[in-house]
Every structure is written in C-alpha cells, then in structure tokens.
Amino acid sequence: MLVPLHFLAVGVGAAAGAWLRWLLGLKFNVSGWPWGTLAANLGGGYLIGLILGLITLHPEWPAWVRLALVTGFLGGLTTFSTFSAEVVQYLERGQFGHAAGYAVVSLAGSLCLTALGLATAHLMGR
C-alpha cells in the first residue's frame, strides 16, 4: 500500500543521497581515481550497517524512518550498500559459499554489463 508519507520519505531521502554522491564526485573524482565514488560506496556500506543496526535496536521507530534512510538516502547515494548488507547477512548465517558466490557474480556481472552497455551505446552511435 502506498502511504503518502512513505512515498515522500523515499523521495526526499533519495534526492539527498544523490546530491551527496554528486558532491563527493565533484570534490574528489579529480585525480584519475574515483575517490568520491569509492567514498560513497564504502560510506554507504558502513551506513547501511549502522542504520539497520539502529533500526533493530529501535523497533518503535516508524516505517518512514527506514524508508527515508535506507531505501531513499542510501539508494540515492549507492546501491552498493544494499549489496554489502546482503553479503554480510550470508556471512552472519554461516553461508560462506553463498556470500562469495553472490559477491563474485555481482561484481563480475556488474563490470561485464557496464562494458556491454558502453558497447551498445557505441554501436547505437554509429
């Protein structure tokens, strides 16, 4: 069910996360290495752990808080944070093969599909 406050929470959080990612890129992606992107991804990995942990400690917090911070803000900042949380969940459950497999497939798949997307765009531009 779409609750207007939830819809707003995701949108505002996503805008803030995207703006931060953009600002990090402007400030730090200047030396040939994407330090701003790395900061967004690694920071997002830390923040999703922190936020999910706090939400677990505070079940009384309303749903819009999680939606604004996790789905919105971290979704706008990076989807890498969700991936990190999922791998850690496998590790916490002792599913080391699943964790490794998911990490390898996610990274290799993302790199391959990025290359494929670039190649497709190149072909479309001919």
UniProtKB/Swiss-Prot annotation:
Regulation of catalytic or functional activity: Na(+) is not transported, but it plays an essential structural role and its presence is essential for fluoride channel function.
Cell location: Cell inner membrane
A Pfam match: CRCB
Annotated GO MF terms: fluoride channel activity; metal ion binding
Keyword match Ribosomal protein: no
Membrane association type: Multi-pass membrane protein
Catalysed reaction equations from the record: fluoride(in) = fluoride(out)
TM annotation in the entry: 5-25, 35-55, 68-88, 99-119
The keyword Ion transport is assigned to this record: yes
Gene Ontology biological-process annotations: cellular detoxification of fluoride
Keywords assigned: Cell inner membrane, Cell membrane, Ion channel, Ion transport, Membrane, Metal-binding, Sodium, Transmembrane, Transmembrane helix, Transport
Superkingdom, natural source: Bacteria
Primary location group: membrane
Binding site for Na(+): 75, 78
GO cellular component, one term: plasma membrane
Function: Fluoride-specific ion channel. Important for reducing fluoride concentration in the cell, thus reducing its toxicity.
UniProt family annotation: Belongs to the fluoride channel Fluc/FEX (TC 1.A.43) family.
Protein name: Fluoride-specific ion channel FluC
Gene symbol of the encoding locus: fluC
